[in-house]
Design a protein with these regions (language model features):
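Bacterial N-terminal signal peptides that target proteins for export
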Residues: 1-9
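C-terminal motif of bacterial Sec signal peptides marking the signal peptidase cleavage site
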Residues: 18-21
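Bacterial signal peptide processing site
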Residues: 23-25
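Phosphate/anion-contacting hairpin/loop surfaces
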Residues: 28
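Short aromatic-glycine motifs in intrinsically disordered, low-complexity regions
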Residues: 31-46
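Mature extracytoplasmic domains of secretory-pathway proteins
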Residues: 45-119
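Extracytoplasmic electrostatic interaction patches
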Residues: 91-153
Length: 153
């Protein structure tokens, strides 16, 4: 009888643990889906603006990845671009960057540390782009990404 109770207790404990694990996965999956919807919404906005729309201003022709993160006061966005885009950007638009050779890849950077740095992009394109998406501090890191902050939707 005691052995049966022990086995029954173990089975119930196992079921409870499985249920908890499944519930945790469901919450995680839902959160990821919410983030993806948000990201896709802004990715569509970015894709909708091309270099032909703003003649003379730079816009990536090929975007590798787009990320948004943050809440409350604002969001940090990163547009990852391929090597050809980086070369085109550095060759054609010197005013986008100063000395970024010492900067690591954005994948290794603490994003809070880049705000207010000396590689702020200040050309006319920023003003146009910022107005449309309420973006501040659009910057190029000189390696693989463009970083921007979005405030107050």
């Amino acid at each position: 009888m005691k052995k049966t109770k022990t086995i029954l207790f173990a089975v119930l404990l196992c079921i409870l643990m499985c249920f908890t694990a499944c519930q945790s996965k469901m919450v995680e999956s839902t959160q990821h889906a919410t983030d993806r919807v948000f990201t896709n919404k802004y990715m569509d906005s970015v894709k909708g603006i091309t270099s032909t729309d703003y003649e003379g201003y730079w816009m990536p022709e090929k975007i590798l990845w787009f990320e948004m993160s943050g809440k409350d006061q604002g969001y940090r966005g990163i547009i990852y671009i391929d090597e050809a885009e980086v070369q085109r950007l550095m060759n054609d638009y010197d005013d986008w960057w100063l000395d970024t050779s010492a900067l690591p890849s954005m994948k290794d950077v603490n994003l809070s540390s880049v705000q207010g740095s000396d590689w702020y992009c200040s050309n006319e394109f920023v003003k146009e782009f910022s107005t449309m998406l309420q973006i501040k501090d659009l910057r190029f890191n000189g390696k693989d990404a463009i970083i921007f902050d979005v405030h107050t939707f």
